């Protein structure tokens, strides 16, 4: 695992050292792959907003996307500074400002954001322009939705994280997208596969056409689980337990959610070369990324965002 001393610079290159920038992010990477990079963006007031992006998704030319960091917002204390949760005790106006900054930095319409309602399900909802603003400007009229899909340009899919796995889906043939939240419960119940199926049912998506990304989340070295969780994964991944579980010999296991989600997407028909997997762990990088485990629950939320370009 290497540490990259990363200045935020608007660049299409990999995470790199730009020490002349205004502040430095020392991101610890689990490997040297170039799956994602940090881009320095700006809100309308000129404030810097660093966003993590995937070259594989950008190469489609069809989407705006990002994964947020803790930096660039106005929240304080344990929520400092880019907290994207209205429900964890932060000041509502601060959170609204943070969402405005994200939208401005991405160049997407704030009023077209659509939120999940995450409860560790595998429910995927098809959203349209009629859903614009739900979660951020008005109440959602749906519950227990951990994944969103759409084929409407300009609608910003939004999901939220602090160790769980973000899953991005782009169908360049049918011009459709999906964004899902997959913690250990979602993963053991194959949320990635459920999202692929939802795209197939709604838009005729062929799995082999999909371009996918597995976003920043907790790594195998940081994610210790109990025997009952390990048993559930053993049942869900028969014959492949050793690819995703490390037995510590004390009734505890280290769980690899990244590899598990790679297997799920591959099993669903996504080509391995069409899957970009994060090399950033939220728990290893809790100074810059919110982590439930590292903070013992005293934290805000990160956000994943995905929009079809008009």
Residues covered by each model-derived region:
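Active-site microenvironment for binding and transforming phosphate-containing groups
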Residues: 2-310
């Amino acid at each position: 695992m290497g540490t990259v001393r990363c200045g935020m610079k608007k660049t299409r290159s990999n995470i790199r050292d730009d020490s002349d920038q205004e502040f430095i992010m020392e991101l610890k990477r689990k490997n040297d792959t170039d799956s994602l990079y940090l881009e320095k963006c700006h809100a309308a007031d000129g404030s810097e907003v660093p966003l993590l992006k995937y070259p594989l998704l950008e190469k489609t030319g069809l989407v705006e996307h990002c994964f947020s960091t803790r930096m660039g917002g106005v929240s304080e204390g344990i929520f400092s500074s880019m907290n994207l949760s209205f429900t964890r005790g932060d000041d509502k106006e601060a959170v609204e400002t943070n969402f405005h900054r994200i939208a401005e930095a991405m160049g997407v319409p704030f009023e077209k954001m659509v939120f999940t309602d995450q409860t560790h399900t595998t429910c995927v909802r098809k959203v349209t322009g009629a859903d614009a603003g739900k979660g951020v400007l008005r109440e959602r009229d749906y519950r227990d939705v951990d994944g969103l899909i759409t084929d409407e340009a300009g609608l910003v899919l939004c999901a939220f994280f602090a160790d769980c796995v973000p899953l991005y889906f782009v169908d360049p043939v049918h011009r459709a997208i999906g964004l899902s939240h997959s913690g250990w419960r979602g993963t053991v119940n194959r949320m990635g596969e459920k999202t692929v199926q939802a795209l197939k049912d709604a838009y005729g998506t062929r799995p082999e056409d999909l371009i996918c990304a597995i976003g920043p989340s907790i790594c195998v070295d940081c994610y210790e689980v109990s025997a009952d969780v390990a048993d559930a994964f053993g049942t869900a991944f028969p014959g492949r337990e050793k690819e995703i579980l490390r037995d510590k010999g004390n009734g505890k296991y280290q769980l690899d959610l990244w590899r598990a989600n790679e297997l799920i997407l591959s099993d669903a028909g996504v080509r391995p070369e069409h899957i970009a997997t994060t090399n950033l762990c939220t728990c290893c990088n809790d100074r810059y990324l919110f982590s439930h485990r590292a903070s013992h629950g005293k934290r805000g939320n990160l956000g994943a965002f995905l929009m079809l370009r008009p």
